[in-house]
């Protein structure tokens, strides 16, 4: 009798365990646990890009043949009073792109054409990039980009162009690198997310508008500024020279230059002087976005 009772108890416990296991599997299928974002771990002995004396074998932790990282920003303003276009916040430059130049200032473009994309919104809106476990959700990132990454032919047209032309040339964002440290989405989607996330991070850290305004330089219509004064204000804030772009005698953009320690996902950016000269000379106008 005792043996029968023990056997029945054993069967009951086994059945309960199976039922609980099945219920748990159904639960995690319907409500998947967010995967944690795995940042890559690269050797501390890897040199900065463009500073290595020998070839670096770990191509997921060393950006090559690029390695001179440029963060380019627009200052778009109408020639006359505000047009229908949205130029972004009045007190902020907007993003042009994040570029991966070679150490000599030349660059590759439209790499890995088979991985080109047609939509950024569709990818960043996917459930896999909005479940949590990420530094910022894909949809929140899109909201930031819609404010600070403006294109004159539509924002998404610019985003797609920048990723296909420059993002796909960042070799430390290759799919095989994500196989090494994991991702919360497909490797291809994760790379797209990371390109735009890192570009936004850099933009939010480096504020050219306030670097100038702290030196008493603000957009105005009635008088030009000395280009050297503006250049010095930007350099004081960044710690290195900053490349300024002008169209005629109007300021239209700035570009910050960096070297990189570790892969692009490390975000270990090291400011350096530009390899290209500024195109702004003499007296230049910084036009308000509201127009003149």
Curated annotation (Swiss-Prot):
Which domain of life does this protein belong to? Answer: Eukaryota
Q: What InterPro entries does the database record attribute to this sequence?
A: Ribonuclease_T2_eukaryotic, RNase_T2-like, RNase_T2-like_sf, RNase_T2_His_AS_2
Q: Name one GO biological process term.
A: mRNA catabolic process
Q: Can you list the GO cellular component terms from the UniProt entry? A: cytosol; extracellular region; fungal-type vacuole; vacuolar lumen
EC number annotated for this UniProt entry: 4.6.1.19
Q: Which residues form the active site?
A: 96, 162, 166
Reaction(s) catalysed (UniProt annotation): a ribonucleotidyl-ribonucleotide-RNA + H2O = a 3'-end 3'-phospho-ribonucleotide-RNA + a 5'-end dephospho-ribonucleoside-RNA + H(+)
Signal peptide per UniProt: 1-23
As one GO molecular function, the record gives: RNA endonuclease activity
Do you know which Pfam families this protein is assigned to? Ribonuclease_T2
Keywords assigned? Cytoplasm, Disulfide bond, Endonuclease, Glycoprotein, Hydrolase, Lyase, Nuclease, Signal, Vacuole
Glycan-bearing residues:
52
Chief location category: other
Keyword Glycoprotein on this protein? yes
Q: Where in the cell is it found?
A: Vacuole lumen; Cytoplasm
What are the cysteine partners in each disulfide bond?
Answer: 42-61, 50-103, 60-177, 111-169, 246-280
- What biological function has been recorded for the protein in this entry? Rnase which modulates cell survival under stress conditions. Released from the vacuole to the cytoplasm during stress to promote tRNA and rRNA cleavage and to activate separately a downstream pathway that promotes cell death. Involved in cell size, vacuolar morphology and growth at high temperatures and high salt concentration.
Family according to the record: Belongs to the RNase T2 family.
Protein name, as recorded = Ribonuclease T2-like
